[in-house]
Amino acid sequence: MKVMDKRRFLMAGGALLAGAAAGLAGCGESEPRSNGATTPAGAVEKPNLKLGFIKLTDMAPLAIAKEKGFFLEEGLNVALEPQANWKVLLDGVIGGQLDAAHMLAGQPIAATIGLGTKADLIAPLSLDLNGNAITVSNRIWAQISPNLPKGVDGKPLHPISAAVLKPVVERFRSEGRPLKFGMVFPVSTHNYELRYWLAAGGIHPGFYLPRDVAGTTGADIQLSVTPPPQMPATLEAGTIEGYSVGEPWNQAAVKKKIGVPLIADHDIWPRNPEKVLGMTRAFAETYPATTTALIRALIKAQQWLDADQGANRPEAVQILARSNYVGADADVIAASMTGRFTYAPGDVRPAPEFNIFFGSFAGYPFASDAVWQLTQMRRWGQIAEDRPDAWYLETAQAVYRADLYLAAARALVAEGVIPAESVPETDGFKEVQTGFIDGVAYDGRAPNAYLAKFAIGLKQGQRVAASGVSPA
């Protein structure tokens, strides 16, 4: 199988979307690929595993590894168990009720440094890149859409800056109430992307303090936690006026005609890390062969998802639509997973990189991606005081375990399962990234210099305490 070429995938996207929406339930009858590249029988120390997940499109590698037989090829009998929210999922892994899980990219990092429940967690595999969007209610859309720059086709020009919300923020403030948005968890990429987008548009999302775990100190807008599947209903009820979430819950708002996605996260930070495979360090050390087998199976699933110019995506849509996985309508899942993204009825745009599972080294747990998560924790006060660059780098490398990923991936290369060029030759730090919506360049080797570039956020020398934010 060839790794997905994004241009060819884009060309095929319309046909894939139509096929998925038409209900191609029968297109997934092919047998799991067998090539002799498996974990030797009896090698795994713990063959029966329970993995947790949240009902989101990006749990796809877990579902595909099970449904296409990749777990079984590696000697694993895996039960996939949906969790009510990210806190329940995290507690399940820490408490041992779950062996591993589909986790937010920031969860293992936050637990390791003691944000919330302290635990020694690791991420030996990145599950995907991109996959989120920010949606607003029809009420907010009606207020901002007339003022948006339009293209020759009459559709809004993208990306849309958060600055368009400034008049809305002021209107709510004049009425004595805050503009409220939802996000999925305090240490989620969704939270940090939403905050980044707001701050880039001149809107302060607030600081976290020991007495303000909601992170609203100094905020122009109020952010609160809502579990992903509950986002559309919470928006429809008027409890929130917008949210940052993964799919299919932005597309669900479009289908229900209750909201409009303003921006996809690849327009905030291209190829950003989204979910990881999370587990305790103790699990990986106690069951090393099992951990390797688990990573191998998921890499195979990631390759399947991005292979042959996206040809497998319609089948993946049908699998994810099942009630034991995401449980959303297939056409809603397909609206973001097959090379295009629906912003509004009649506004469907090419989005070949909305979900990346295997291409662009999506599985490799880059330390620089973990450092970025840490910088945002510091920027908004979850990390109370300055830390040296070395602390950021050492923490990132201790949690994002590229060594475990490489052991599994290089074996798959040697066996001819994945191409050698799909595994990066790297020290774990990407080159300086310049594609952020605000144009600020990010060098993962220099986190403090990066933090100093922002107009909104904690400054060098500032710290947070119960009494508030100290001056720099």
What are these regions (language model features)?
Residues 286-403:
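Secondary-structure end/capping motifs
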Residues 371-472:
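Conserved C-terminal helix/tail region of periplasmic/extracytoplasmic solute-binding proteins
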Residues 1-18:
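N-terminal secretory signal peptides and thylakoid transit peptides that target proteins
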Residues 19, 150-189, 193, 293-339:
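Ligand-binding clefts/hinges and TM-proximal coupling segments of bilobed small-molecule sensing domains
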